[in-house]
């Protein structure tokens, strides 16, 4: 299995993975702009040119505290590849990358419905932070 960061030519395969994992459509132009920058990266695992697992990483540096955080979104594994340890492998790779880049924290949000994913996060040492998520549609 090949580990890589998402490139423009990988976008169609990534869109299929996100559709499979979350039943949502990717905004291709926004995704393309995001991966061209330096703040957002998508770590992907490929088998035969198909992305079978991935995580979107947004790096944030708090200018007041000087702390670097890797914030994870769309941790996903293609349904036919689930149960093979890829979710754990994704998290291990992110933690290793965060350590290598001197990050202070790795953070993510997860739906209560995603029981398998939440188990992985707890098993990998993540804790629930005492925070409420506020949201306002504009």
Regions found by a protein language model. Name each.
Residues 91, 98-110:
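Conserved GNAT acetyl-CoA-binding A-motif
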Residues 77, 83-96, 119, 123:
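Conserved acetyl-CoA-binding loop-helix of GNAT-fold acetyltransferases
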Residues 88, 112-130, 135-136:
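Conserved active-site alpha-helix within GNAT-family acetyltransferase domains
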Residues 75-77, 110:
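Hydrophobic adenine-recognition pocket in adenosine-nucleotide-binding enzymes
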